[in-house]
Each structure stands twice: as structure tokens, then as C-alpha cells.
């Protein structure tokens, strides 16, 4: 039923949000192993979301490749946002 689809999608989206938050927290810590694990968890659940929506991972990669090919696609960092 439609409510089952909504519940499943809601559960997946909540998990993606949780993993995104955990990735942000790990990024602020000094442990790169923790960060790698959290990025892995986030990507896994994003892939689950894609599969649930019938979206092939290759379609996501295609968009990434298109963005990399665009000239001037780099965002300008604020002074406080620049990476060292």
C-alpha cells in the first residue's frame, strides 16, 4: 500500500540523515578511520535510497562527471571556509 511505501522511504531518509550527521561529527574529530567508516555508512544508505527510488548509481556518477566537466563550476569559498 502507499502508506507502506511512505514508511519505507521515511525510514531510509531518516537513516541517510543520521549517517550524514555522524559523518559531520566524525569530520570534526581527528580520527580518519572513524571518518572513513562514517562516509562508508552514508554512501551505503544513499545507495539504498537510490535503489528504493529506482535510480541507478551510474546515473548519479553521470551527473558527477557532468559537473566536473563544467567550466566555472567550482564554488567560491569564504575566507573562513578555505581548507588549509
Model-predicted segments: where are they?
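An amphipathic alpha-helical micro-motif enriched in hydrophobic residues
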Residues: 16-24, 32-54
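Short, small-residue-biased leader/transition segments that mark boundaries at the very start
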Residues: 1-6
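N-terminal "mature-chain" segments and other terminal, solvent-exposed stretches
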Residues: 11-14, 77
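Short leucine-rich amphipathic alpha-helices used at interfaces
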Residues: 30-31, 37-38, 75, 81
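Short glycine-rich loop/turn motifs that provide flexible caps or phosphate-binding loops at active sites
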Residues: 7, 16, 71
